[in-house]
C-alpha cells in the first residue's frame, strides 16, 4: 500500500511516479564498499529465510508451506502487525518461524527492493543495498531495516538497480539487462566498476 493508502502499487511505475522519477536519484546511500573478496549469494542456494511484506502479495498457503522449513521475515508497519499476525495464525502458519520486521513499505515487490545478500571479505554474511528504481522511499529502506533487524553488516551504493534485474550463480558470474545502464546517470564503464567492486 502506498504510504498507507488502500491501493497496491503495480510492479511498473504509476503516472504519479513517472512525474516523480527524479526522486529516485535522491534516495541512494553510499557507504564504503565491503572488504574483498566479495561473493554474491545465488538465489537458489540454501537459505534460512524468505522476505515477504504485509499486506501480502502471495497466498497464505504458500507462506504456511514456507514457514514449515524456513523463517518468514515479514516487513509490516507497526499499526498492521496485529492484523498480519492474526491472518498468519488463522492460516496455519508456523508462528515460531515468523519474524516481523517493523517499518512501512509501499508495495509487496520485495524481490525488487529487498536486500542483496553477499559474503564479504571477512566471511560475514552481509547486505548489499542498491537504490530501488522506483520513487518508493519506504520500499527503498527495506535493506537497511533488515540489516538493523538482523544486526548484519550493511554496504550501500547509490547505483540504481532493482533486484528483479539481477541474477548470479554465486560463483562470480552475474547478469542484468541494459536497464541498469539506462537508469543511471553515469557511464556503462562506471556502472560495471561499481558492480565489480
Describe each model-derived feature in a short phrase.
Residues 1-197:
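The feature marks the mature, well-folded catalytic cores of soluble enzymes
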Amino acid at each position: 500500500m502506498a504510504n498507507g493508502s488502500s491501493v497496491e502499487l503495480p510492479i511498473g511505475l504509476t503516472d504519479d511516479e513517472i512525474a516523480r522519477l527524479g526522486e529516485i536519484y535522491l534516495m541512494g546511500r553510499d557507504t564504503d564498499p565491503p572488504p574483498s573478496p566479495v561473493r554474491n549469494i545465488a538465489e537458489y542456494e540454501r537459505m534460512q529465510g524468505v522476505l515477504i511484506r504485509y499486506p501480502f502479495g502471495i497466498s497464505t498457503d504458500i507462506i504456511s508451506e514456507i514457514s514449515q522449513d524456513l523463517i518468514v521475515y515479514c516487513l509490516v508497519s507497526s499499526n498492521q502487525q496485529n492484523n498480519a499476525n492474526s491472518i498468519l495464525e488463522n492460516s496455519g502458519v508456523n508462528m515460531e518461524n515468523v519474524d516481523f520486521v517493523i517499518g512501512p513499505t509501499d508495495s509487496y515487490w520485495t524481490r525488487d527492493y529487498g536486500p542483496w545478500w553477499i559474503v564479504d571479505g571477512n566471511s560475514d554474511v552481509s547486505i548489499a543495498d542498491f537504490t530501488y528504481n522506483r520513487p518508493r522511499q519506504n520500499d527503498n529502506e527495506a535493506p537497511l531495516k533488515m540489516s538493523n533487524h538482523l544486526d548484519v553488516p550493511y554496504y550501500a551504493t547509490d547505483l540504481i538497480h532493482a533486484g528483479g534485474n539481477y541474477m548470479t550463480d554465486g560463483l562470480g558470474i552475474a547478469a542484468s539487462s541494459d536497464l541498469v545502464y539506462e537508469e543511471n546517470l553515469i557511464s556503462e564503464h562506471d556502472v560495471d566498476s561499481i558492480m565489480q567492486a
